[in-house]
Amino acid sequence: MRPPKNELPAADATRISRTLSYLLRHAPQTIGLRLDPEGWADIDELIAGIARLGHPVDRATLETVCATNDKQRFALSDDGRRIRAVQGHSTPVVQRRYPAAQPPERLYHGTATCFLDSIRAQGLIPGARHHVHLSPDIRTALAVGTRYGVPVILEVDAQRMHRQGHTFFVAENGVWLTDAVPAEYLTERDAPAR
């Protein structure tokens, strides 16, 4: 039995989401896709580029992936003609401007134990991305950390950082962003049992 037209099998949704993340965050040039400084791309150009990769996708499927993605990674423009990744960009073309926001008392970052020595030495840095990504809750941070090995949760004293001049932003999907988190604002927490 096939799923209804507006539902995708989980494996297909994951594959398409990963393709969109790669193209809209990191490598639009691989399909000749143009992004504006806010990360928007023309949906028709994206569909044509993905088809050239041998993975045809239609507009309805893109809309379904955007609407059902558990992390709300993608956004469609109000007129339905453009699409973008909400955050996570590494391509220098994109320089999204997020509104500054006052963070909650604590934010969280999920990582793996193998990265702790580096984090203890230099804090959290964005690496190839434009910002450090922080979660508003431990469960989300744990899911992120689990992807990379034995997870550990880093608690960020976000209010103290903010009071001391660090700027925070919040993306449309609830992911908190900042330029870096110095080690002095981090506390290691054991990952809770799943």
Region locations from a protein language model:
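Eukaryotic, polar/proline-rich low-complexity intrinsically disordered regions
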Residues: M1-R194
